[in-house]
Amino acid sequence: MEGVGGGGGGEEWLRPMDAEQLRECGHRMVDFVADYYKSIEAFPVLSQVQPGYLKEVLPDSAPRQPDTLDSLFDDIQQKIIPGVTHWQSPNYFAYYPSNSSTAGFLGEMLSAAFNIVGFSWITSPAATELEVIVLDWFAKMLQLPSQFLSTALGGGVIQGTASEAVLVALLAARDRALKKHGKHSLEKLVVYASDQTHSALQKACQIAGIFSENVRVVIADCNKNYAVAPEAVSEALSIDLSSGLIPFFICATVGTTSSSAVDPLPELGQIAKSNDMWFHIDAAYAGSACICPEYRHHLNGVEEADSFNMNAHKWFLTNFDCSLLWVKDRSFLIQSLSTNPEFLKNKASQANSVVDFKDWQIPLGRRFRSLKLWMVLRLYGVDNLQSYIRKHIHLAEHFEQLLLSDSRFEVVTPRTFSLVCFRLVPPTSDHENGRKLNYDMMDGVNSSGKIFLSHTVLSGKFVLRFAVGAPLTEERHVDAAWKLLRDEATKVLGKMV
């Protein structure tokens, strides 16, 4: 096996799927990954390379002959890893998490081994049927209304990202509205969201042909942790109705990106219902927490929703990508996204006896993503997954208390889940209201490589985000981050004197 570990290689690499070669290489890759995780704290959390660094160290054309695995591992260690920002580091507190786990990793391995393209039931019945079953399991864990189950008119499907989930929901809503009001009414369709809604909705509107001037961005209520005020939505809607426009879609969020705000679902749901609008709920981040009984109330009002999404790949130990979408009536999704060319026709599909997930998504091809979610649920169980969520929320609460113990800092919004929004309080003489002060503090700790934070802007304030959610994070990592922040705060405040 020269091409695997030793010298030349030659014909060894003309067998792309040899079981024994896979066994040897696979063992070595698993060892490499395990060693990476064991030593992950030794790496700077935020990559410290400069743009274009990789072009300087890799050749400008592909090799004519096969290289060795040893050489490849060396290049990964010396050239690739320096350019990796380590999302699985226990000191990663920047964006909402992207969880990995042994179960998720094993599921990805098995999915890669089967390497099916499961666009219809016939292409791999197990892929379709497992997805239906696991999404029903998850809906029951979240206590979603029975209409979202596959046994009713609705059902669940795995999308790549929440952006895709929001897009397909919007397309279904658009086509439902056009069917009711006429195909020439597109220019009158209006979407409602808040200024805290994820930018994915804006992109979805661009793709769906919704006029930019018909996207109502309602300013969130800073007195309600930046949740949207139903009264403001109703007011905007009334103005649009009087102008002859057609309100057709409301997007609410459970756990906004900037502050983890929870929009008032019951009130927004009633607005949507009263005006025959599609009501979508994006719980990409915080949906995972709602498997815990003490956080389930944040989904009260979901019974009025037409669609609901959350990301298992964020905070549910399921490797990226795995975004879960449920709809109350799958026919609207299928009518909007279905295509049926001759080469895809088959007996099972023609008999309408199976689910073809190609008609629930944008692309034709799809991966066997339900495997990893199934393995996460099987190997960890709901009780342990709830404990995992609670641990992160406890660590965020601990960090919040540390902030409150130092008068130099302020917690900008009340903590709801595992995100803490805070800033260094600027001196009264600071005409920038702390923007540069907090940017410099963030840049200082990020440049150290010891932790990674991100920021947002709330009511004009430059605010730092401390998002707990990496699988390896313990209390000692939170304490170390706090010490680093205090030291950096002393440094940047000293420069202002």
From Swiss-Prot:
Residues annotated with N6-(pyridoxal phosphate)lysine modification: 314
- One Pfam family name from the record? Pyridoxal_deC
Q: Which SUPFAM superfamilies does the record associate with it? A: PLP-dependent transferases (SSF53383)
Q: Which residues bind pyridoxal 5'-phosphate?
A: 162-163, 257, 311
Co-factor(s): pyridoxal 5'-phosphate
| Stored CDD domains | DOPA_deC_like
Alphabetic keyword roster:
Decarboxylase, Lyase, Pyridoxal phosphate, Serotonin biosynthesis
Annotated GO biological processes are:
serotonin biosynthetic process from tryptophan
Where are the bilayer-spanning segments? none
Query: What sort of enzyme, by top EC class, is this?
Result: lyase
The protein's matches in PROSITE patterns, at most eight in alphabetical order, are given as: DDC_GAD_HDC_YDC (PS00392)
Annotated signal peptide: none
Q: Which GO terms describe its cellular component?
A: cytoplasm
Report the catalytic activity: L-tryptophan + H(+) = tryptamine + CO2
Molecular function (GO) terms for this protein are:
carboxy-lyase activity; L-tryptophan decarboxylase activity; pyridoxal phosphate binding
Tell me which family the UniProt entry assigns to this protein. Belongs to the group II decarboxylase family.
Mind telling me what this protein is named?
Answer: Tryptophan decarboxylase 2
What is the originating organism of this protein? Answer: Oryza sativa subsp. japonica
> What would be the name of the gene that encodes this protein?
TDC2
